[in-house]
Design a protein with these regions (language model features):
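Catalytic cores of alpha/beta
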Residues: 120-125, 250, 309-325
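Canonical Radical SAM [4Fe-4S] cluster-binding loop centered on the CxxxCxxC motif
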Residues: 17, 29, 34-41, 46, ...
Length: 380
């Protein structure tokens, strides 16, 4: 029996970004009663840990949250006796992970994540780390059979929104997206039900469907029956992310199968920029999706990207002037502001100030304005 340590970076380990944090605090406070629960350490449970825990049932598993700095992780690892330490690398923590591994040279690390260029370079430079592109590869490195499912025992009692997978892939081909496109691979009904039942260890009212574009896979209608597998008497439904076009066409059906909230890939309210980035959307579809959702009592959140090359004072203003009145009127319940990430150029990724091009000041102004205005509206 092996000793496996999962390391997860808590929100508090990262720099605070001012208006962004104010917005999310306001959002979770406003919608807490319907089930928007923020975890004690992180916004949501890291699903990769639950997936790996599922296929190593016979190992001793331990979870460690890094709340402040890498010194905590280094001390934990060097004072323990672990066969493997597992971490997930993102732009925001990549240099922290590199430091941890370099300071624990006798420890074996398995690392997965999103920035392949950085991870491959790290693997070349540090002999005690192996990169795993998928959880299936992690199973291979651990020498166990891979089986998809989830085990949330390590998170027992946490007050959160768990994630559930119906399918992998996406039929769209958005220019800035790293999700494999052109094909959808559905998950079996048996595995979908297993995931739902595994949430019994958690305190939740909403479940987030983490398909990149909900409604593309043929099995999305299973949500209608899936609610009965929740052991929570106050279960309130599902959150999905999808396109404006699918919401415009299927808002009524989504509500009928217990979708409570839809996040739409609005990104920017500008046709020219949407076309440039191959978004399956338009100003027309965006308007239609808002109307359809409102008419069918489907709560709507607009995902917005700040920093897209091509944005100007005029285009930002157009998006802002479209979105904020909808938030005021309750036709949107929130926005999801995100920073544009160019994964082919990772020199300055991971912090709000990575956008150091000629539009840096403009992007920064609008990032703060979107977050501050939305927070003010939700705080009322």
């Amino acid at each position: 029996m092996r000793n496996i340590l999962f390391v997860q970076f808590a929100n508090s380990a990262f720099l605070r970004h001012g208006e962004c944090d104010r917005y999310w605090d306001a959002f979770y406070k406003r919608w807490h009663d319907i089930g928007y629960y923020m975890g004690k350490y992180v916004f949501e449970i890291p699903k990769w840990i639950a997936e790996i825990a599922y296929f190593i049932p016979n190992d001793n598993k331990e979870l460690f949250y890094c709340e402040h700095c890498v010194d905590e992780i280094v001390a934990k690892v060097n004072n323990g006796s672990y066969d493997y330490v597992l971490m997930s690398l993102m732009n925001a923590n990549q240099h922290m992970i590199y430091e941890v591994i370099s300071r624990c040279p006798k420890q074996k690390f398995l690392v997965g994540g999103y920035n392949d260029k950085f991870m491959r370079q790290m693997e070349k430079e540090l002999p005690n780390v192996v990169i795993c592109d998928t959880t299936a590869e992690t199973a291979e490195k651990l020498g166990v059979p891979y089986k998809f499912g989830t085990d949330y025992t390590l998170f027992k009692g946490e007050h959160v929104i768990p994630r559930l997978t119906l399918s992998y892939g996406c039929l769209n081909n958005c220019k800035f997206c790293i999700v494999p496109h052109g094909k959808i691979t559905p998950v079996s009904d048996e595995v979908i039900i297993q995931q739902m039942e595994s949430f019994s260890d958690l305190d939740y009212r909403l479940v987030y469907i983490d398909d990149k574009t909900f409604g593309q896979a043929s099995n999305y209608k299973i949500l209608k029956e899936l609610s009965k597998y929740s052991d929570k008497d106050d279960f309130n439904g599902f959150i999905v992310q999808t396109t404006t076009g699918l919401v415009a066409k299927k808002a009524k059906e989504f509500r009928e199968i217990n979708v409570k909230v839809a996040e739409i890939g609005l990104e920017t309210f500008n046709d020219e920029i949407l076309r440039k980035y191959r978004k399956p959307s338009s100003e027309k579809f965006i308007r239609e999706s808002v109307s359809a959702a409102y008419e069918n009592d489907l709560m709507l959140i607009a995902n917005i990207i700040v920093g897209l090359p091509g944005e100007t004072q005029e285009t930002y203003t157009k998006t802002y002037d479209f979105v904020m009145p909808l938030l005021e009127k309750g036709k949107l319940i929130g926005i999801n502001p995100a920073i544009y990430t160019d994964y082919d150029n990772d020199d300055n990724l991971g912090e709000i100030d990575f956008m150091k091009d000629e539009q840096y000041e403009l992007n920064k102004i609008w990032w703060n304005k979107f977050n501050a205005s939305a927070a003010e509206i939700l705080d009322r």
